Amino acid sequence: MKAVLLDKPGPPSSLRIGEISIPGPGVDEALVRVCATSLNPVDYKVAAHGYEGWRYPHVLGVDVAGVIETIGEGLVSWNRGDQVFYHTTWRKDGSYAEFNVAPAHTFACIPEGISFVEAATLPCAALTAYCALHRRLHVREGDIVLVHAAAGGVGGFAVQLAKAAKAFVIGTCSASNAKYVRDLGADEVINYRSEDVFQRAKTIAGDRGIDAIIDNIGPGNGVDNLGLLGPEGGLACIAGVPDLSVVPDLPYSISIHDIGLGGVMASPAFRRRQEDLGRMATEVMTLVQVGRIRPTAAEEITLEAIPKALERLAEGHVRGKIVARVQS
């Protein structure tokens, strides 16, 4: 099968297109014909340092939307020909290929009327945002939610999901993305280039503080983020947790969460959490079907164009999701 291959740890520019054998499914697994996959920052981040369990050449990618080709031993819940989408693992060969093998308990159905491209935007970005908001921060109606990097993949879904939960949403982005973020549902938009983000957010929230923060940028803003939280507020860190040794004591109960779906797939011992990926995917797709959120596919490319597109993604400031069509 055709795949995007990594011969050793390195940058996106080191990736190449090549041929490898089609894998076979194990017990309770399925072989899926990949119709579409989307790009995520985790792809180039793990490529840079590699993983001790990888066999090279390695296939990157964690987002799959496709059709079940072959059923593994013991699998009775899915059938050949079913259309599915799911978050696979970066610890084994991933989605930048014509076929992928994964445990079927992570699958969710692609309903009629939803394209493979639309479904492919959801697994990593939408499930990360959904996990942060509904499995960790437990956002409720009336909460004030701050989303950093609101025009990105996770950020865009976080804005939509928070708004679907009837929260008041503040998004940070550049001036060129302000309309896009407002169209996603943000009530207030802060231009991080021309405004003091934390002072403006504090002014918007007032004395009550912010209930939930989704930080897609990195740990450098940790102290400032925590200073915005109100009583029992929470910070969900998508790109690394802050150095807690420099965090001052706060006079109220807060929570800090490190969100990383890839770790859930590290071991069969985490099956309960893996099954929740499938449940979250189904819950997110239901919101798509009823129009509460929409997929954010901003650009469609070919499998061969993935290396160059990953280079652009690594440079930052990509709006929405880049999706590769792999097979029909």
Name each model-derived stretch.
Residues 120-122, 126-194:
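Mid-domain Rossmann-like dinucleotide-binding core that forms the NAD(H)/NADP(H) cofactor-binding site
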Residues 77, 87-149:
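NAD(P)H dinucleotide-binding glycine-rich loop of Rossmann-like/cofactor-binding domains
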Residues 85, 146, 190, 211-214, ...:
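N-terminal Rossmann-like NAD(P) cofactor-binding module of classical short-chain dehydrogenase/reductase
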Residues 285, 290-299, 307-328:
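C-terminal capping/lid region of NAD(P)-dependent oxidoreductase domains
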Residues 21-38, 48-91:
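Glycine-rich beta-strand-centered segment in the early N-terminal region that forms part
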Residues 35-36, 71-73, 89-90, 105, ...:
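Short, surface-exposed secondary-structure boundary micro-motifs
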